[in-house]
Design a protein with these regions (language model features):
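Acidic (Asp/Glu)-rich catalytic clusters
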Residues: 53-57, 78-91, 130
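Glycine/small-residue-rich loop that forms an oxyanion/phosphate-binding "nest" at active or ligand-binding sites
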Residues: 99-132, 138
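Conserved, mostly hydrophobic/aromatic
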Residues: 39, 93, 139, 253
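Active-site rim beta-loop-alpha module in soluble metabolic enzymes
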Residues: 177-235
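Flexible, glycine/charged-enriched surface loops at secondary-structure junctions
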Residues: 129-137, 234-245, 277-284
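C-terminal domain-boundary segment and adjacent tail
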Residues: 170, 264-284
């Protein structure tokens, strides 16, 4: 055919000649992107928890404890500074005021309390981000706060109210497919749908409770296969053997001991070998 072609904005190709024009579809290979996040800054005073400097070599986003379930002002500042030096995006990791229970115990809090908890903790970390000229990329709840906000509408609403009060541009990193994820999207809050490399899933899309069989995936190869399935196919096999749909924007990994560091490194290397681009949301 004589003539020329125009590549349209919808990725179709239109051939234009003297006699006729015809439109055909163009096949485009879309690369998969994924973020790797980890909970950091959870030391406190003289007590050291985790291997933050090591895990920062393998993740792209950090969830920084804000002083209530773990962390303190000096740890928060040091973690933000270290993230900047290593090119890792910073996120706030607010929890319940429960140092003794590491924020994993359920608490009965009112919507007003939950909203204030958010403003208090995010505001503190935002101050350190300002000090080092670092963008606060996201917010991810911790422990019981995270789990309860996934299924309790009043709590989720209060959390999002607090987030929007501090900075409406900060992304909400939330459990994929949860109530809080849907409500954040409805409000127009940027959402990061989170999945877990080392946790089992129920048919409802929630995490298998830590006390139940199948809660943890300990074999690195099995974990990698599950992560690749979630990232590339949008599916995960539950603890009953059923396959359900899931959206994966970020994968949570851990780095609180040498074995966990090796696990995280294995996941990242496996993603890269599979052609998945590992990057945070500021570097895309």
């Amino acid at each position: 055919m004589n003539g020329f072609c125009i590549i349209n904005i919808d990725n179709s190709i239109e051939y234009i000649g003297c006699v006729k024009s015809v439109t055909v579809e163009r096949s485009i290979h879309m690369s998969h992107f994924i973020d790797l996040n980890s909970d950091l800054g959870e030391s406190f005073g003289n007590y050291t928890l985790g291997m933050d400097s090591e895990v920062l070599n393998h993740v792209t986003s950090a969830n920084v404890a804000c002083g209530w379930h773990a962390g303190d002002p000096l740890i928060m500042e040091a973690t933000v500074k270290m993230c900047k030096e290593k090119g890792v995006a910073v996120g706030a990791h607010p929890g319940y005021p429960d140092l003794m229970g590491f924020g994993r115990r359920k608490m009965a809090v009112s919507p007003d309390e939950a909203r204030a908890y958010m403003i208090y903790q995010l505001g503190a970390l935002q101050g350190f981000c300002n000090q080092y000229d670092v963008e606060l990329q996201h917010m991810k709840l911790h422990g019981a706060f995270y789990n309860m906000a996934c299924v309790t509408s009043e709590l989720a609403d209060a959390v999002l109210d607090g987030l929007q009060a501090v900075n409406p541009n900060v992304r909400a990193m939330v459990l994929s497919g949860s109530y809080i994820a849907k409500e954040a999207e409805r409000r127009g809050i940027p959402v990061i749908q989170e999945v877990f490399a080392d946790r089992g899933y129920t048919e409802e899309g929630t995490l298998v409770p830590r006390t139940e069989e199948g809660a943890f995936i300990k074999d690195p190869q099995e974990a990698l296969e599950r992560v690749l399935m979630m990232v590339q196919e949008g599916k995960v096999v539950t603890n009953t053997g059923k396959t359900i749909d899931i959206v994966a924007d970020s994968v949570c990994v851990h780095g609180d001991n040498p074995k966990a560091i090796a696990f995280t490194k294995y996941i990242r290397e496996g993603l890269t070998k599979a052609g998945v681009i590992v990057a945070n949301f500021q570097n895309r």
